[in-house]
UniProtKB/Swiss-Prot annotation:
Binding site for ATP 2: 164, 197, 261-267, 275-277
Protein name: Universal stress protein MSMEG_3950/MSMEI_3859
Family (UniProt): Belongs to the universal stress protein A family.
UniProt xrefs under Pfam families: Usp (PF00582)
Cross-link (Isoglutamyl lysine isopeptide (Lys-Gln) (interchain with Q-Cter in protein Pup)): 109
Record InterPro entries: Rossmann-like_a/b/a_fold (IPR014729), Universal_stress_UspA (IPR006015), UspA (IPR006016)
Disulfide bonds: none
Key words of the record: ATP-binding, Isopeptide bond, Nucleotide-binding, Ubl conjugation
Entry's Gene Ontology molecular function annotations: ATP binding
Binding site for ATP 1: 13, 117-123, 131-132
UniProt-listed SUPFAM superfamilies: Adenine nucleotide alpha hydrolases-like (SSF52402)
Domain of life, source organism: Bacteria
Annotated source species: Mycolicibacterium smegmatis (strain ATCC 700084 / mc(2)155) (Mycobacterium smegmatis)
Amino acid sequence: MVQSATEYGILVGVDSSAESDAAVRWAAREASLHDAPITLMHVIAPVVVSWPAGPYMATVLECQEENARHAIEQAQKVVADCLGETHGLTVQTEIRKESVARTLIDASKSAQMVVVGNRGMGALGRVLLGSTSTSLLHYASGPVVVVHGDDQAAHDSRLPVLLGIDGSPASEVATSHAFDEASRRGVDLVALHVWIDVGDIPPIGPTWEEQEETGRALLAERLAGWQERYPDVKVHRRVERAQPAYWLLEEAKQAQLVVVGSHGRGGFTGMLLGSVSSRVAQSATTPVMVVRPR
């Protein structure tokens, strides 16, 4: 079983947007699966002006606080509508007044995972929450889940969990979370290894067949111990020759959750988000869990 922080449980950033509501719905179901608390957090970003603050500033701050209360109340209603009024889940709420990204990154250290919508924050949402999501994917502690609206596949309990494996230490950590998620959902796990990311240029050295065999051996090595720990999870092993991000995005269409490491082959400790993980997190319609180290 995956060890996790417990103060915040499943931490979800809320802001009253439709994308935020979708993230709350996903987080509520996730908290129920883990029997964990859910924390609804709204962060009031500092107001930056290029002229001296006048009497109007008090009105601006009051409006921000009112919006924050509304965002929390709306998120609480979403949880109740999703799980029922008598769900029994511990719902915690918190309003902070700091940098949005910095606050959520700091809070991630005390959370089992952080869940965010792919955009939000009103009219400028794509800029603001887009940058917040990106910052979390680069710097948060532990898993970050990006929810892309109310994708129906995310609610289809029959679909498998998709795991991207590349043999890196980061994908090993992702493997533990993928097995745990599949086990809790009672679904299969598709373990996908894509073994070429340089196009269709014939390699100098091992043949395609040898490369494929190496990929299968890598999958077997990475999965052996985990299959023993989670005998209830049926694993489908897939080895493909293609662009990794493209193939993961294609397979994601038939999955309820995609799990990837924060960076892949050749990554250094502390390296920023890998290009494959970044593209999948940005482009998939299925919820994507990017597992970062703690």
